[in-house]
Amino acid sequence: MRIAFMGTPPFAVPTLAALHTAGHDIAAVYSQPPRPAQRGKKLQKSPVQLWAEEHGLPVRTPKSLKSDEAQAEFAALDLDVAVVAAYGLILPQAVLDAPREGCLNVHGSILPRWRGAAPVQRAILAGDAETGVTIMQMDAGLDTGAMRLIETTPVARKSAGLLTHELAEMGALMMRRVLSELHAFPPVPQPDEGVTYAAKIDKSEARLDFLVSAVQVERQVRAFNPAPGAFFELEGERYKVLAAEVVHPAETVAGAAPGVTIDDRLAIACNPGAIRVTRIQRAGKPAMEAGEMLRGRGIAKGTRLA
């Protein structure tokens, strides 16, 4: 099939790679424009753009697809289908309508649950038992299009990073399967029941809130790993918590105030219960096991964390 691929972050790369390996005619790869790196002013290309250029695929990086010129260039590609995976730009109706089979999206949730920008993180925060990938026929709404294929996977105690990687690989195989026999996967409208929205993660959410249950705090840690990174502060220094576990109730100290350490091994009282930090990163330092850090920078029982 003659395809345009549209994607930007690492999540999108496995799908592009799968389409390339399958021998599809990739007429163009669309990705968001290079942006300044976090440190310094040098522009950094997206993972999708880098992969496409390494494999000799033509790349386009418009800031928007709203102009008549951009839409005419897209229509001139004469596509069978466009495949979209975390592109990050709104597709106008003229773009959605241009390919003969429309635009197919790889979405990291079991639609209609968690429509929107952060489905993986929101599924973890909500304590969902499972999540998955939906191959969706795109329309003008926010992840409201008809569904062609859904597959699921347990959330378990996976971090957002690990789960995103798993869903990216799953979605790539699913999209390859759908495109190999498109009309065997007819679009099915999403149900009206069970709709939830996965709002974009705000950095302010990453500060650990010890006033909630230990179970919820541990979910925060997993949901924000690797980014933006769950954290607490002590004496003006930020500590990023990369992994934690819920402490057995027998290990908690009755009456301990939320946010106060209940031993010298970085167990922290919550409301109720407690968590123990198992992997941590101090500002400007490499990540390490919590026990290793504590040997160099002890945090005594009864210390209040913010």
From Swiss-Prot:
| Keyword set, alphabetical order | Protein biosynthesis, Transferase
Question: Is Protease tagged as a keyword?
Answer: no
Which HAMAP family does this entry report, sorted A to Z?
Formyl_trans (MF_00182)
- The positions making up the signal sequence are none
Q: Keyword Transferase, does the record have it?
A: yes
What this protein is reported to do is described as: Attaches a formyl group to the free amino group of methionyl-tRNA(fMet). The formyl group appears to play a dual role in the initiator identity of N-formylmethionyl-tRNA by promoting its recognition by IF2 and preventing the misappropriation of this tRNA by the elongation apparatus.
Task: Read off the InterPro entries from this record.
Answer: Fmt, Formyl_trans_C, Formyl_transf_N, Formyl_transf_N_sf, Formyl_transferase-like_C_sf, Met-tRNA-FMT_C, Met-tRNA-FMT_N
What residues does (6S)-5,6,7,8-tetrahydrofolate bind to?
109-112
Gene3D superfamilies reported for this sequence: 3.40.50.12230
EC number annotated for this UniProt entry: 2.1.2.9
This chain's protein is named Methionyl-tRNA formyltransferase
Per UniProt, what is the name of the gene that codes for the protein in this document?
fmt
Q: Which reaction does it catalyse?
A: L-methionyl-tRNA(fMet) + (6R)-10-formyltetrahydrofolate = N-formyl-L-methionyl-tRNA(fMet) + (6S)-5,6,7,8-tetrahydrofolate + H(+)
GO MF terms, alphabetically ordered: methionyl-tRNA formyltransferase activity
One GO CC term of this entry?
Answer: cytosol
Which organism is this protein's natural source?
Sphingopyxis alaskensis (strain DSM 13593 / LMG 18877 / RB2256)
Tell me which family the UniProt entry assigns to this protein.
Answer: Belongs to the Fmt family.
Known Pfam families for this protein? Formyl_trans_C, Formyl_trans_N
